[in-house]
């Protein structure tokens, strides 16, 4: 048979495309193999279709040749052409049934899907060899076969018989070269079976005559159809499963969307939390700033308190000065009045010119006195403004005073009632209209002119002892009585000496109304003097009266100099020999009643002595005790007084003369600290560290004031009752403090002993200036404000800080090992910094991370600076755990058992957060430097002390024969007398960091 040209061209085109498809199958696996098989099957369909059409058009049928089948797994399923059956029959007969049996075995393998590729390829190679092709070609060309072949559906032609199809050759070659060793998948097999069932349906003659295996093939096809149906069912089931999986995927996508929404909301919550944390940190920083401001306000309050005390002292001194001025003015007026009387009552012709001269001189003096009074009023108004300003400042301080003032109020109430200065102020404030009515005098320091303008100038000094004025104006004195003893005379300084060159601004009267009243009273005295000068007097009682008056008005020449001109000097010189008239009784009685009424209403008997002492304080005199006592004794012997007055004077002098050496500005004792009045000292008026020479002579009242001044007013009664003097106090022991003075607190006993020892040894250290207010602020700086109450109760100051022991710390409830170490290292830092209050830094450098290591800077950090550093290294969420923890820079530098692990435990970092702990350790080691870290590591390796932890406890080892309890794991045993900061630092503390050079180089 001959193929048509169109079919041949299509065949050639398809043959040329086969190698390309095979190459693709080599690269892409089963997918490309499926495409290859599909294209091969289509080519075979075209060949068969074209062959059938050609066989119908031709009339001659050559010998049938083999039709190539391109799939190895279905080659044996196709029956050979009729032309080849006769060729195979002799071979089959020669080999018996071996070939058929073998073929049957292969078919069974195909049915079961177990055919081996290599066995199939060997079978193909064994059956379809080139010799068989040649033999079949020869048989077909001879045409001498006597057996007639049945008609075949396959195309037969000379070209196809002599040359097998190229597709077949390439496919066989691929199988021989084992390039298609993979088994075809199920889909490929189904396609092959469909092609076999659809394209190889034999004719009836072929099924009955030429193909005895046709029933078996039909069974196989039926089984394959059933397998196809089952596979389709499986595919449908799988598609349903895929649909279910898709629904599950959709559900999962919905869940994922919900999770994403939850994650978004969680992130928003976290952002809000971070914002809240930032706000909390800001509030914490503001809180720390407020605490610092409160501490500064407390310090300012303490400063204002001291200033208030000083202002009160100045105010009292001013009141005393004014009172002394009034007394001096009163004495001068009395002397002037007596001079008027003597001038007016003198007899003889020579007294008339003297009286006229005296009258003219009095007019001049009164004009000058008025001028001085005007200046005094102006100065007094200025002084009143200053006093009002001071009082307003005191009122403001009193309104802002805290509860401490209430605590000391009871100690001051009973003393204020007996304060002479307070009584004077009350009199001046309650009765301003007549507050100066008792003194119709002018200040001692008033200027006057000399006689005829030629006399020398002299100065009248204020008296340091005013007993003479007291006797002169005492209500018990009688001008007409005759005194025993020799009358004393006035001591003139010289002839023509006058009072001169004195300013009136040295002393001021209590209030402007009183100063204005002074001029009116002077005018009244002048009128009384002029009226008295016109009366006639008898000369019988003149020597006696004048003698008594002179004896009562005479002041010591060392203290007061009085001169009234030439006439006064002549009068003083001839007082004992010249007979002088005596004033009338009505004038004497009138003057005496006026003076007695004023003094009875305004003054006490012992007041002048007190005023004298206050005046000595104001002038700052350093009086000699022996000299003052001798002067007073001499003065007392020359005077004649009544017995009652002598008793009062002895009482007042006995209490004041013993302490005359201490009555000066800045001394520990005050003039009003007498046995009669009790302790009238306010807090701040007694020095905490007086000189030893003064302290040994202190009495019980002064020592009681001192014990209150150092902060223990609860022991005032015991001290005033049992301690006789300062020397006795210095010689007392600790047991006497507890048994006699009832000081049960051991910290109080230690502080009293420390202060007494420093007074005795005159120890001057930088710690002396460190008070309890600075200690309380220092506790805020180191992060331990919870101990402020107990430190304030024990009045812990600088000297006591240096002397605190482990037993004292336990007594003050400091039992946490971490807090104990914080106090110890902070005290060590204060000692190195010479107790400079501003040595610690509350703020850190913003570029601190770039300046690692810097131990000299870290040692000055406060607790708040450490928190700021933690925020700087991104650990802000843990800083709130440092509240009341106490982690200053001194603890990190000086404490060898404080490591990064200790800080992590204080920050409460979870142990499983190793990255955070490693981050903290890295920054901690870089901050302190390798040397300090190496010292800490070596110290802990020795095993003498455990690493600090927030759960550690301090235990004081008690010496005795009792059974010792086993030490717990977190306990640190210390000796009772071990100092928190020893005098000499031993190997327990690292060296080389935070020395004094670092403080000198700092700007604090």
Swiss-Prot record:
Sorted UniProt keywords: Coiled coil, Repeat
Residue spans of biased composition, Polar residues class: 434-453, 531-541, 648-684
Matches recorded under SMART domains: SAM (SM00454)
Expressing tissues: Expressed in pharyngeal muscle, particularly posterior bulb, adjacent to the dorsal and ventral cord (but not in ventral cord neurons), and in body wall muscles.
Coiled coil region boundaries: 280-328, 364-396
Protein family according to the UniProt entry: Belongs to the liprin family. Liprin-beta subfamily.
Functional description taken from the UniProt entry: Involved in the regulation of synaptic function at neuromuscular junctions. Together with the liprin-alpha protein syd-2, may play a role in regulating the structure of the neuronal region, called the active zone, from which synaptic vesicles send neurotransmitter signals across the synapse. Does not seem to be required for neuronal development. May regulate the disassembly of focal adhesions. Does not bind receptor-like tyrosine phosphatases type 2A.
Protein name as it appears in the record: Liprin-beta homolog
Source lineage: Eukaryota, Metazoa, Ecdysozoa, Nematoda, Chromadorea
Name of the gene this protein is made from: hlb-1
């Amino acid at each position: 048979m001959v193929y048509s040209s169109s079919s041949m061209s299509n065949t050639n085109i398809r043959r040329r495309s086969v190698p390309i498809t095979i190459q693709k199958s080599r690269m892409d696996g089963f997918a490309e193999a499926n495409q290859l098989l599909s294209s091969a099957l289509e080519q075979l369909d075209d060949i068969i279709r074209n062959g059938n059409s050609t066989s119908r058009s031709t009339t001659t049928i050559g010998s049938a040749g083999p039709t190539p089948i391109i799939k190895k797994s279905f080659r044996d399923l196709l029956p050979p052409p009729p032309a080849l059956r006769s060729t195979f029959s002799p071979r089959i007969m020669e080999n018996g049934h071996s070939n058929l049996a073998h073929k049957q075995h292969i078919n069974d393998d195909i049915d079961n899907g177990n055919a081996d590729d290599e066995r199939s390829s060997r079978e193909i190679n064994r059956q379809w060899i080139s010799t068989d092709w040649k033999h079949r070609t020869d048989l077909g060309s001879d045409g001498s076969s006597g057996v007639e072949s049945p008609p075949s559906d396959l195309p037969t032609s000379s070209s196809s018989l002599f040359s097998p199809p190229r597709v077949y050759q390439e496919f066989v070659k691929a199988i021989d070269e084992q390039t298609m060793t993979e088994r075809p998948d199920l889909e490929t097999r189904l396609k092959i079976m469909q092609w076999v069932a659809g394209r190889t349906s034999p004719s009836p003659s072929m099924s009955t005559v030429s193909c005895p295996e046709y029933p078996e093939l039909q069974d196989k096809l039926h089984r394959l159809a059933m397998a196809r149906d089952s596979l389709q069912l499986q595919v449908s089931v799988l598609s349903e499963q895929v649909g279910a999986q898709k629904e599950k995927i959709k559900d999962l996508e919905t869940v994922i969307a919900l999770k994403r929404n939850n994650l978004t909301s969680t992130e928003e919550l976290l952002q809000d939390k971070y914002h809240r944390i930032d706000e909390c940190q800001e509030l914490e920083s503001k809180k720390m700033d407020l605490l610092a401001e409160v501490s500064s306000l407390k310090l300012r309050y303490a400063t204002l308190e001291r200033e208030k005390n000083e202002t009160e002292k100045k105010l009292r001194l001013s009141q005393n000065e004014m009172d002394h001025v009034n007394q001096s003015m009163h004495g001068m007026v009395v002397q002037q009045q007596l001079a008027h009387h003597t001038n007016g009552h003198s007899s003889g012709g020579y007294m008339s010119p003297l009286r006229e001269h005296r009258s003219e001189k009095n007019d001049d003096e009164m004009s000058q006195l008025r001028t001085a009074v005007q200046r005094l009023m102006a100065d007094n108004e200025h002084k009143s403004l200053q006093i009002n300003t001071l009082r307003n400042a005191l009122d403001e301080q009193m309104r802002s005073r805290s509860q401490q003032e209430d605590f000391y109020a009871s100690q001051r109430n009973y003393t204020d009632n007996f304060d002479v200065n307070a009584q004077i102020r009350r009199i001046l404030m309650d009765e301003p209209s007549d507050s100066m009515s008792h003194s119709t005098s002018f200040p001692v320091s008033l200027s006057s002119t000399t006689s005829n303008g030629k006399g020398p100038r002299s100065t009248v000094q204020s008296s340091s002892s005013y007993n003479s004025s007291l006797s002169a104006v005492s209500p018990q004195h009688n001008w007409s009585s005759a005194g025993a003893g020799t009358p004393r005379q006035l001591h003139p300084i010289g002839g023509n000496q006058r009072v001169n060159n004195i300013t009136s601004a040295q002393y001021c009267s209590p209030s402007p109304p009183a100063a204005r009243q002074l001029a009116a009273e002077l005018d009244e005295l002048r009128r009384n003097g002029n009226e008295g000068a016109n009366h006639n007097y008898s000369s019988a009682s003149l020597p006696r009266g004048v003698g008594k008056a002179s004896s009562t008005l005479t002041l010591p020449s060392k203290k007061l100099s009085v001169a009234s001109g030439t006439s006064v000097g002549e009068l003083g010189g001839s007082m004992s020999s010249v007979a002088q008239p005596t004033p009338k009784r009505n004038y004497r009685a009138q003057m005496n009643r006026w003076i007695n009424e004023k003094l009875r209403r305004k003054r006490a008997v012992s007041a002048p002595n007190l005023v004298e002492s206050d005046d000595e304080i104001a002038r700052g005199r350093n009086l000699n005790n022996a000299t003052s006592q001798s002067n007073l004794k001499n003065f007392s012997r020359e005077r004649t007084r009544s017995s009652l007055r002598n008793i009062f004077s002895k009482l007042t002098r006995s209490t004041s003369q013993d302490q005359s050496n201490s009555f000066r500005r800045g001394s520990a004792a005050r003039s009003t600290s007498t046995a009669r009045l009790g302790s009238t000292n306010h807090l701040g008026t007694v020095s905490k560290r007086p000189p030893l020479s003064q302290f040994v002579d202190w009495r019980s009242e002064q020592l009681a004031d001192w014990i209150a001044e150092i902060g223990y007013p609860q022991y005032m009664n015991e001290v005033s009752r049992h301690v006789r003097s300062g020397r006795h106090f210095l010689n007392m022991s600790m047991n006497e403090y507890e048994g006699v003075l009832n000081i049960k607190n051991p910290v109080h006993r230690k502080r009293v002993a420390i202060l007494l020892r420093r007074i005795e040894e005159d120890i001057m250290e930088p710690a002396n200036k460190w008070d309890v207010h600075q200690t309380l602020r220092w506790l805020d700086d180191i992060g331990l404000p919870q101990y402020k109450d107990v430190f304030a109760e024990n009045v812990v100051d600088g000297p006591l800080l240096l002397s605190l022991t482990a037993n004292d710390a336990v007594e003050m409830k400091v039992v946490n090992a971490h807090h104990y170490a914080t106090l110890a290292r902070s005290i060590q830092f204060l000692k190195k910094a010479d107790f400079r209050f501003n040595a610690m830094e509350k703020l850190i450098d913003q570029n601190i991370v770039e300046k690692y290591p810097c131990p000299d800077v870290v040692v000055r950090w406060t607790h708040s600076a450490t928190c700021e550093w933690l925020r700087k290294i991104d650990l802000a969420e843990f800083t709130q755990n440092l509240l009341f923890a106490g982690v200053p820079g001194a603890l990190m530098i000086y404490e060898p058992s404080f490591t990064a692990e200790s800080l992590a435990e204080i920050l409460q970092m979870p142990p499983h957060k190793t990255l955070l702990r490693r981050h903290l350790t890295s920054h901690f080691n870089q901050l302190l430097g390798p040397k300090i870290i190496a010292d800490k590591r070596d110290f802990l390796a020795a095993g003498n002390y455990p690493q600090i932890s927030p759960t550690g406890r301090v235990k004081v080892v008690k010496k005795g024969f009792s059974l010792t309890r086993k030490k717990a794991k977190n306990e640190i045993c210390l000796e009772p007398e071990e100092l928190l900061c020893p005098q000499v630092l031993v190997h327990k503390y690292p060296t080389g960091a935070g020395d004094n050079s670092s403080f000198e180089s700092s700007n604090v």
